[in-house]
Amino acid sequence: MKMVLSQRQREELNQAIADYLGSNGYADSLEAFRKEADLSTEAEKKFGGLLEKKWTSVIRLQKKVMELEAKLTEAEKEVIEGAPTKNKRTPGEWIPRPPEKYSLTGHRASITRVIFHPIFGLMVSASEDATIKIWDFETGEYERSLKGHTDSVQDVAFDAQGKLLASCSADLSIKLWDFQQSYECVKTMHGHDHNVSSVAFVPAGDYVLSASRDRTIKMWEVATGYCVKTYTGHREWVRMVRVHIEGSIFATCSNDHTIRVWLTNSKDCKVELRDHEHTVECIAWAPEAAASAINEAAGADNKKGHHQGPFLASGSRDKTIRIWDVSVGQCLLTLNGHDNWVRGLAFHPGGKYLVSASDDKTIRVWDLRNKRCMKTLYAHQHFCTSIDFHKAHPYVISGSVDQTVKVWECR
């Protein structure tokens, strides 16, 4: 369909084209165009840069239209499937939905971990480019970079108050950063013999745990930087360490296909969980709010066969997610659906859902009670490596090998 311009619109377009040709040094083309379009020698100042402005405006509008179309498709799908619409959903039912609110760029290599600050409207990303970046997740603004590691930063973790940030790296070190004022590295701890793959604070904040490719887990005193305990038992690379909210136990997962749960105050392994058929990449402790959904999914009621927990989720290269009752060392349910390695897990604060990130480039939202994938987000152009769910605000963040960090709004 041919678009018809008014006489005034044609004159403005011709003036804008003439300005563009003149501004970019196309003198011969400008002379020919002026002659054919019957334009005066000098264009008015108001036409300066007009063509570029209109062009960028069209691109912005196209992007907005695509976002609105994605939201409309999403709403139509929910109506057809009979899912609760936004007005009918409670905050406990809000889940991440496309399109992403922000796609943040700046890292020069794969993203290895993304986490929210426990109090402020900030998030942190770690990357194989050896840097840590801080972002405002509500505005999408880049805040600053933390530099000090000399190799890939593998994991980051905040203490409960968000005053200290711990990081670990393939450079064999663990670093503590002041997150209140200076944003400087205040301690560097050495002791592992290989790549340090994961870090986590004990809830009281006085100790940090680290997991390594050297097959050990170490406990470090924050005040002194000294290693006070070394836990051994895994037969291969220890991929991740995560501490239970009460602080008395912590879990680790490994290339040896197992998950181990340890007593924090001793070096004893409380239980070893075996069922995965490949490397276990990630683990996440379930909040208390998830107990009801997990028990129902496991076929237990409050009178008979009720599982007390605590409950732990694990994701593996065998493409499955498993939910465990740690107190008895039993796998209660298995979630199937990903087409590649499962790399990240995070529970919905309301306890009804679990979100997962995978090398199949998707984020999946799992309805725990019904043991099914209720939503798939085609999140990134490459492997999804990490995910986090904010405990108080309706946001999810994800990181990828495509070097982007994405912020997803829950609704």
Swiss-Prot record:
Its main location: cytoplasm. It comes from the Eukaryota. SMART domains: LisH, WD40. Residues 9-41 form the LisH domain. GO terms for cellular component: axon cytoplasm; cell cortex; dendrite; dynactin complex; dynein complex; growth cone; kinetochore; kinetochore microtubule. Pfam families: LisH_PAC1, WD40. GO terms for biological process: border follicle cell migration; centrosome localization; centrosome separation; chorion-containing eggshell pattern formation; clathrin-dependent endocytosis involved in vitellogenesis; dendrite morphogenesis; establishment of mitotic spindle orientation; germarium-derived cystoblast division. Keywords: Cell cycle, Cell division, Coiled coil, Cytoplasm, Cytoskeleton, Microtubule, Mitosis, Repeat, Transport, WD repeat. CDD domains: WD40. GO terms for molecular function: dynein complex binding. SUPFAM superfamilies: Lissencephaly-1 protein (Lis-1, PAF-AH alpha) N-terminal domain, WD40 repeat-like. WD repeats lie at residues 106-147, 148-187, 191-230, 233-272, 275-334, 337-376, 379-411. It is found in: Cytoplasm, Cytoskeleton; Cytoplasm, Cytoskeleton, Microtubule organizing center, Centrosome. Residues 56-83 form a coiled coil. Dimerization mediated by the LisH domain may be required to activate dynein. Belongs to the WD repeat LIS1/nudF family. Positively regulates the activity of the minus-end directed microtubule motor protein dynein. May enhance dynein-mediated microtubule sliding by targeting dynein to the microtubule plus end. Required for several dynein- and microtubule-dependent processes. This is Lissencephaly-1 homolog. It comes from Drosophila virilis.
